[in-house]
């Protein structure tokens, strides 16, 4: 379910961007001038270390909004937004987005809930990295990713590489590979054609 219905967004000056896989919507350090919502497709928010290592801050699917905090606090984007697949992104200019929030309290309240949920996720990741063994970290991360994906009666296909799972969970890729193999052997997940299903 989208935070902002498309007809309402269009009344506030929204446009829809069509992007290809691996297109960059905005870069870390850019000024935030728009509210963004996924109409179709998937986005990852990432930061990069000095040696080029990618850390995935979040994944966003159809109906999800992303990149809002800099709109409210006037700081630069702390990460880059990159498409995982071909995507359509709804975008509303910052000033019109604030008008929309002022005139639609239900949207404002729902956005508050979304931001609180993201804080909860960040807290979970910090706890996982600090206190738990690799299998627990991976199970928690896969459970979270599955909860964010569209509901399906099929096993959830993890849209990340083992390197990306390592980057999100604070582990080395070798540890993730060994742990996933053990989890497959114990029936906690499946691997088909090198893809992870949970």
Regions found by a protein language model. Name each.
Residues 141-145:
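Short amphipathic alpha-helical elements of helix-turn-helix/winged-helix folds
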Residues 23-85:
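Cyclic nucleotide-binding regulatory domains
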Residues 19, 38, 198:
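Conserved catalytic Walker-motif region of ABC-type ATPase nucleotide-binding domains
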Residues 7, 12, 57-116, 120:
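Cyclic-nucleotide recognition modules
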Residues 2-21:
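Short proline/glycine- and basic residue-enriched helix-capping loop/turn segments at helix->loop/beta transitions
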Residues 146-198:
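Phosphate-/nucleic-acid-contacting segments
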């Amino acid at each position: 379910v989208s935070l902002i219905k498309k007809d309402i967004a269009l009344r506030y000056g929204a446009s829809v961007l069509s992007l290809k896989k691996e297109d960059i919507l905005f870069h870390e350090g850019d000024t935030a001038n728009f509210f963004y919502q996924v109409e179709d497709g998937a986005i990852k928010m990432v930061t990069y270390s000095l040696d080029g290592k990618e850390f995935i801050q979040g994944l966003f699917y159809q109906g999800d909004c992303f990149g809002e905090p800099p709109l409210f606090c006037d700081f630069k984007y702390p990460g880059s937004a990159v498409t995982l697949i071909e995507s359509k992104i709804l975008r509303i200019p910052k000033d019109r987005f604030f008008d929309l929030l002022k005139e639609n309290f239900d949207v404002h309240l729902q956005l508050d809930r979304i931001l609180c949920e993201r804080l909860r996720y960040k807290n979970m990741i910090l706890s996982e990295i600090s206190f738990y063994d690799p299998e627990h970290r991976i199970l928690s991360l896969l459970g979270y990713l599955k909860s964010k994906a569209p509901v399906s009666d099929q096993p959830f296909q993890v849209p990340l590489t083992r390197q990306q799972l390592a980057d999100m969970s604070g582990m080395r890729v070798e540890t993730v590979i060994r742990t996933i193999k053990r989890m497959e052997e114990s029936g906690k997940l499946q691997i088909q054609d090198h893809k992870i299903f949970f």
